[in-house]
Amino acid sequence: MFCTNCGNQMADGTRFCPQCGTQTGAAAAAAPAAPAVYRLYMDAKGLTMLNYKFEVRDAAGNLRYRAATVTESMFTYNARIYYPNDAEALAIHQQKKMTMMAMNFDLVAPNGGLVTQAMQNVKLTKYSYTLPQLGITVDGDFLSLNFVFYRNGQPIGAVRKKVMAWGDSYEVEYTDASLEKVFLGMVMVVQLVIAANRNRRR
């Protein structure tokens, strides 16, 4: 085989040209394929002084989920995510016990099984959560409401709030489709924290 850059002859299977360092076709074939990236778009579709409602669509505009926060009292906050046929996809329940002003939540499957806890790390300028059952951490800031999901120190998803949008709108990007509802659930967690902070100021 020959280097496509300098023409140097090499043994078959050589990954980099010893003459100029150019990557060969063998190296490209051996490199792992980049993971697929999925995107969903979460837009507010009506809200009251207490609760938010959202529609979640894919890039083609297909409705994938509906979501709503449910403020049961001044101190209890929950949310639900539904499929388009109104079947429940995920429930988000605030844990009753508050520690150092942290708001912790349980993400619960339709069969009642715990998917993960969402444990808030109290920080001055960030929304920071740990999802211990999934080995995921979530970091975001108060101002932009953009946040990133990490597993083993590597980013696996991100949520970006649309700045020039009417109401609260988010782009949700991720590489692990099995965690799709978890990412959406964490958007709802942040919405519940926002609602709680708003109620405390009243």
Show which residues each predicted segment covers.
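Low-complexity or membrane-interfacial segments used for flexible interactions
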Residues: A28-N78, P84-A89, Q95-N104, P110-R202
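Cys/His-rich metal-coordination motifs, chiefly Zn-binding "fingers/knuckles"
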Residues: M1-A31
